[in-house]
């Protein structure tokens, strides 16, 4: 059975590691996970699923990758969230909020009588301590609080946050998967070793308010979450969640097919997804992600320093044919320059007519026709096929294209390499941290940004416009500035947009209530999912 896709965005820059699990080891693993979901009542109240690899440490102020968001969203909560399927910001631990006329002061009205898992009140004073911890830990998500000038708690349910300067992305920071979480100050103080702010303790424990408590965290083996009986919100259906670390997707598939797993959230090859769609024992949910697959051009070295050549590339490809062939109908060609949930659909269209003529006219004049085309392996077999289809489509022009795989670690290090050592062309993805265009631009276009500004683009005017846009009081005003940036980068022809990358979740047919995260659609709301 196939569910209709939700129009979401998604981000993901994750590396997938592998271990071969064979023979007896595989049989033992399947046996350990149990058989059909109907074995007994207790099994019916345990949700079982795999991760491809260990998540980063489950510290709410350190964890900054994709798959682990499932654990964090079960144990911790933020002030606000994205409404599933949209970029609309809705209440979380803050039931309402206001913004001052000068765009500097947010006043959050907190849900009353919420407690952390250790019984400490999750009040405004606790939120101030949470902000302070994130700043002090100073890991990847810390930038979300660096713009805070001061936080105040005039009463337990009122949190006043004053920014150093206007920032219209602030609520998006608070809603994104790596949002500012409420962290129990009692747990931090009690379990701190020296000045580590309980970092060691939080490697295997939690200090949140979420619907689940971390019961076991065994790296390389499994994580177990148990329902928090004093949860303030909607009680979860499942008493516990068991997440097993299973590095091979083939092993995950076998266990799903045998009923040992209730769902596999990501990672299946497209042929497997299509087969599951035809199998009534399973539900498949295909959702466009927040990342866009693009063809980057090396504008700082080699033949693609020629702007006219890059502009000719923008129209030379039959993008629809490439996307349809590589993704077999699971996503569609990108007709906007930016992901639709990150920037209003139709406001920055990109749908040029196919015209290979300008490229055919330029290629004979090039000093070299040898092209190095790489594709990032974390994007799987479809990315390889996209690269090979580009190679085939451009061959008649006389370009001599060699296709090669590039591991994610190498992609992340391109920014540190000399321009001439970067590939001429690169099939990769781009996105941000939240459903706000500023987060993508600062990652991929900001002067000096690393690691994902792989070709080290830099333009002082683009930087200035970014800083202007984020201070605008309305979306319309900000979008007008973002259109100026779009005009600049489109004219410079830095990349060719191809498609939003689809995410495919497969569940047993008796699993219902999947409410996906708007940003990472392979993450679901843990207190909404049920067995029917």
Regions found by a protein language model. Name each.
Residues 1-12, 19-28:
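N-terminal secretory signal peptides
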Residues 50-101, 132, 207-209:
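N-terminal lobe/hinge region of extracytoplasmic solute-binding protein
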Residues 83-84, 88, 177-236, 240:
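Gly/Pro-rich hinge or "lid" segments in bacterial periplasmic/extracellular proteins
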Residues 109, 143-191:
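Surface-exposed binding/hinge segments that line
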Residues 200, 228-274, 400:
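Ligand-site clamp/hinge motif
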Residues 328, 332-365, 377-385:
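Structural transition elements
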Residues 402-412, 439-509, 532:
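Extracytoplasmic/peripheral linker and loop segments enriched in polar/acidic and small residues
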Residues 505-532:
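Long beta-strand-rich cores associated with HINT superfamily self-processing modules
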């Amino acid at each position: 059975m196939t569910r209709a896709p939700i129009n979401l965005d998604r981000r993901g820059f994750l590396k997938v590691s592998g271990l071969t699990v064979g023979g007896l080891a595989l049989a033992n693993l399947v046996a350990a996970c149990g058989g059909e979901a109907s074995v007994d009542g207790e099994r019916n109240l345990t949700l079982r699923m795999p991760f491809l690899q260990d998540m980063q440490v489950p510290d709410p102020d350190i964890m900054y990758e994709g798959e682990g968001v499932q654990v964090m969203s079960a144990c911790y909560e933020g002030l606000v969230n994205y409404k599933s399927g949209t970029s609309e910001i809705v209440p979380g631990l803050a039931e309402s909020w206001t913004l001052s006329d000068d765009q500097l002061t947010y006043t959050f009205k907190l849900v009353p009588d919420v407690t952390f898992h250790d019984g400490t009140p999750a009040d405004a004073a606790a939120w101030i301590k949470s902000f302070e911890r994130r700043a002090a830990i100073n890991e990847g998500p810390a930038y979300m609080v660096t713009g805070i000038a001061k936080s105040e708690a005039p009463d337990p349910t009122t949190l006043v946050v004053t920014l150093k300067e206007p920032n219209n992305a602030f609520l998006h920071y608070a809603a994104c998967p790596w949002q500012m979480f409420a962290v129990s100050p009692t747990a931090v103080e009690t379990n701190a070793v020296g000045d580590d702010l309980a970092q060691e303790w939080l490697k295997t424990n939690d200090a949140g308010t979420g619907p689940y408590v971390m019961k076991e965290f065994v790296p390389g083996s499994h994580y177990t979450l148990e329902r928090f009986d004093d949860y303030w919100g909607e009680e979860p259906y499942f008493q516990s969640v068991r997440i097993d670390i299973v590095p091979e997707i083939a092993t995950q598939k076998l266990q799903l097919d045998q009923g040992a797993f209730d769902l596999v959230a990501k990672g299946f090859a497209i042929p497997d997804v299509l087969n599951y769609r035809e199998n009534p024992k399973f539900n498949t949910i295909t959702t466009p992600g927040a990342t866009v697959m693009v063809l980057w051009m090396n504008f700082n070295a080699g033949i693609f320093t020629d702007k006219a050549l890059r502009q000719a590339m923008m129209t030379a490809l039959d993008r629809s044919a490439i996307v349809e062939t590589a993704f077999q109908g699971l996503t569609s060609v990108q007709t906007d320059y930016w992901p639709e949930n990150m920037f209003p659909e139709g406001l920055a269209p990109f749908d040029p007519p196919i015209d290979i003529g300008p490229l055919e006219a330029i290629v004979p004049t090039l000093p070299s026709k040898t092209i190095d085309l790489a594709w990032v392996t974390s994007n799987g077999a479809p990315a390889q096929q996209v690269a090979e289809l580009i190679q085939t489509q451009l061959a008649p022009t006389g370009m001599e294209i060699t296709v090669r795989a590039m591991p994610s670690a190498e992609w992340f290090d391109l920014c540190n390499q000399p321009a001439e050592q970067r590939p001429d062309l690169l099939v990769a993805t781009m996105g941000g941290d939240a459903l706000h265009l500023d987060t993508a631009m600062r990652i991929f276009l900001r002067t000096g940004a690393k690691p994902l500004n792989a070709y080290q683009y830099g333009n002082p005017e683009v930087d200035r416009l970014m800083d202007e846009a984020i201070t605008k009081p309305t979306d319309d005003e900000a979008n007008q500035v973002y259109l100026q940036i779009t005009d600049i980068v489109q004219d410079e022809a830095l990349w060719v947009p191809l498609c939003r990358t689809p995410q495919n979740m497969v569940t047993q047919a008796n699993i219902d209530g999947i409410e996906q995260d708007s940003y990472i659609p392979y993450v679901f709301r843990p207190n909404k999912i049920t067995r029917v």
